[in-house]
Amino acid sequence: MLRREARLRREYLYRKAREEAQRSAQERKERLRRALEENRLIPTELRREALALQGSLEFDDAGGEGVTSHVDDEYRWAGVEDPKVMITTSRDPSSRLKMFAKELKLVFPGAQRMNRGRHEVGALVRACKANGVTDLLVVHEHRGTPVGLIVSHLPFGPTAYFTLCNVVMRHDIPDLGTMSEAKPHLITHGFSSRLGKRVSDILRYLFPVPKDDSHRVITFANQDDYISFRHHVYKKTDHRNVELTEVGPRFELKLYMIRLGTLEQEATADVEWRWHPYTNTARKRVFLSAE
């Protein structure tokens, strides 16, 4: 079983590397083609291979943009089968972190919550794979305040690491009543860059396909690379007006890393993207939107 998993993982990484190399070559050819069409200087980094790229441009035809490899897509079953989400915490959780994990379990339809106990990460991931879990969520805390969320897609990845801030739990608001567990409609806003679409896919594929008559709405709104999570239910007061009610919880997410592997491969998996906060331009740059 371990040999089979290692072989499948190697094949998956090889396909990902080939696809990334092909995408990079296609981007260089597109930059050269635009420079030739607009009669501009060829970019400095492309001048050595400009003749070879121009020769290969003759064999390119229109219509191949945006095509993805279904064999190499981690989310190829999204929309066909409902995701199976498992939620757990860091070791020795406080009572508030347990409450937050319970609220997250109600956010994702069909999710299950598991007490962490003394289980190691490797044992958790193996158990999730054996039971057909598609996504493992781990919540971290600092002195009772949730500060981190890890979303690991199984069986091969990716794994996204988020910082949590401005967390307001349902337990903090009196007389909220029960939460609807219907499959929600999703709103994603502000994810216009390539990395933004990647993060949007990681988040939205945690939810199953909703029914048309569902009155539950979950929003992921990106502004300046902070992703606001909001949870509402709506009801129609008449044929023109709709009344929105926030049911919580609410929090902000800040992405700081994406790894290509699963959670237990933290030491060996390649880093797909990492936030570098200590560079001179870190405060000015936004990564999840193309603005």
Swiss-Prot record:
One of its GO terms (cellular component) is Mpp10 complex. One of its GO terms (molecular function) is snoRNA binding. GO terms for biological process: ribosomal small subunit biogenesis; rRNA processing. This is U3 small nucleolar ribonucleoprotein protein IMP4. Keywords: Nucleus, Ribonucleoprotein, Ribosome biogenesis, rRNA processing. The keyword Cell division does not apply. Its main location: nucleus. Part of the small subunit (SSU) processome, composed of more than 70 proteins and the RNA chaperone small nucleolar RNA (snoRNA) U3. Component of a heterotrimeric complex containing IMP3, IMP4 and MPHOSPH10. Interacts with MPHOSPH10. It comes from Pongo abelii (Sumatran orangutan). Residues 83-264 form the Brix domain. Component of the 60-80S U3 small nucleolar ribonucleoprotein (U3 snoRNP). Required for the early cleavages during pre-18S ribosomal RNA processing. Part of the small subunit (SSU) processome, first precursor of the small eukaryotic ribosomal subunit. During the assembly of the SSU processome in the nucleolus, many ribosome biogenesis factors, an RNA chaperone and ribosomal proteins associate with the nascent pre-rRNA and work in concert to generate RNA folding, modifications, rearrangements and cleavage as well as targeted degradation of pre-ribosomal RNA by the RNA exosome. PROSITE patterns: BRIX. It is found in: Nucleus, Nucleolus. Pfam families: Brix.
